[in-house]
Amino acid sequence: MAQVINTNSLSLLTQNNLNKSQSSLSSAIERLSSGLRINSAKDDAAGQAIANRFTSNIKGLTQASRNANDGISIAQTTEGALNEINNNLQRVRELSVQATNGTNSDSDLKSIQDEIQQRLEEIDRVSNQTQFNGVKVLSQDNQMKIQVGANDGETITIDLQKIDVKSLGLDGFNVNGPKEATVGDLKSSFKNVTGYDTYAAGADKYRVDINSGAVVTDAVAPDKVYVNAANGQLTTDDAENNTAVDLFKTTKSTAGTAEAKAIAGAIKGGKEGDTFDYKGVTFTIDTKTGDDGNGKVSTTINGEKVTLTVADIAIGAADVNAATLQSSKNVYTSVVNGQFTFDDKTKNESAKLSDLEANNAVKGESKITVNGAEYTANATGDKITLAGKTMFIDKTASGVSTLINEDAAAAKKSTANPLASIDSALSKVDAVRSSLGAIQNRFDSAITNLGNTVTNLNSARSRIEDADYATEVSNMSKAQILQQAGTSVLAQANQVPQNVLSLLR
């Protein structure tokens, strides 16, 4: 080896080794201080990528576990609401069993139906208001997906179903609906009659509703004017009394001619503005048409102006063809051909009333015709029908009986087999509750599996990126010794050029 001064090879070699030991010492100290074997990609590029993927999975699965717990909470909230709906249904069933007992009076059935209605309304309220984090869980059919994995498509679906009165098949549930109307019901409705069978008189008023085509009850009101379809009496409704005035009789097709002729004669013999008395009622000639007795006369009853129109009447042997009462209020008018006219300020309709005897019995087959539709009641006591459809007796909130047709009764009709309907509703609720219970158990299983997976992934990631302290402490001790030795040797190496100077002495 040459003896040189400019280049100290031993010193350079020692410095290089000293730098290596310094780097090892720094790495060991960094790992020991961070607890990680991989602090940057340079420590282990592949290991860093693998550990990073594990981290993504671990974080995703941890959140998925929380999602599954939220799913359990949703199912529990929904199931709790269904439990309350079930309680209401059980009470409705209990009341329905009570209602089917024949010992109940009408008031008992009404009280039972009132509570049933309240219970059904509570079911709808629970359905509309139950929600989880702003999501209504029973108001509509919905599939709620719960993410229970770290990747796309890893979901569990909760089937939320609409549970309300309508979806349970209990819409219109009624244990106190209208009953089929019979002739007995029809006869009993014609009461408070004096002398004649009156189609519209007294406290219970029946009329034909042209709009719906159903016979309905009309409560006593001060703004109705009626004409007796059997005897021609004019009847005005008053809360305190009924005023009747005989105008003319219409029990036969030719009856009433004398009375009508008397009015026509008064018109013919007078002039417009003249007054005359007929059967204790003062009439005024409003309009006179020609000299044949045609025209209009009017009178006032209970403050209501009523006009009688006489047309096509011959003073001779001809029969009366038509006579119509008109008023600003609702008017029911009897005419000699057995028809009566409805004046409802918008249109006039006709209906035929026949074969109702004065003693309130039904003679043969009684028919009421409205716009071609015949209401038929057989004298044998059979039910009343309209065009083959059964009529029903219903009671309003005030207790007034109403005769309604089959279509109108459909919404009010007592529920057929009410207990079976309730059992069906309970079965549907039970099915939904069972589904929610099963989904809760499934979520529990998913949470357990997610926990196991997260634990295993954490262990795998730890083996890749966590520092082994035994190894790192050993590496640090080794590096420290090398540092000390290197520093000492470097001092010796730096003294080697001094030996060359001895050659110059």
UniProtKB/Swiss-Prot annotation:
One Gene Ontology molecular-function label: structural molecule activity
Gene3D superfamilies for the chain: 6.10.280.190, f41 fragment of flagellin, C-terminal domain, f41 fragment of flagellin, middle domain, f41 fragment of flagellin, N-terminal domain, Flagellar export chaperone, C-terminal domain
Highest rank taxon of the organism: Bacteria
Pfam families named in the record: Flagellin_C, Flagellin_N, FliC-like_3rd
Coiled coil: none
One GO cellular component term: extracellular region
Localization annotation: Secreted; Bacterial flagellum
UniProt keyword Coiled coil, yes or no: no
InterPro entries noted in UniProt: Flagellin, Flagellin_C, Flagellin_C_sub2, Flagellin_N
Purpose of the protein: Flagellin is the subunit protein which polymerizes to form the filaments of bacterial flagella.
Record's miscellaneous remark: Individual Salmonella serotypes usually alternate between the production of 2 antigenic forms of flagella, termed phase 1 and phase 2, each specified by separate structural genes.
Originating organism: Salmonella dublin
Keyword Secreted: yes
Alphabetically ordered keywords of this record: Bacterial flagellum, Secreted
Family recorded in the similarity comment: Belongs to the bacterial flagellin family.
Disulfide topology: none
Name the UniProt record assigns to this protein: Flagellin
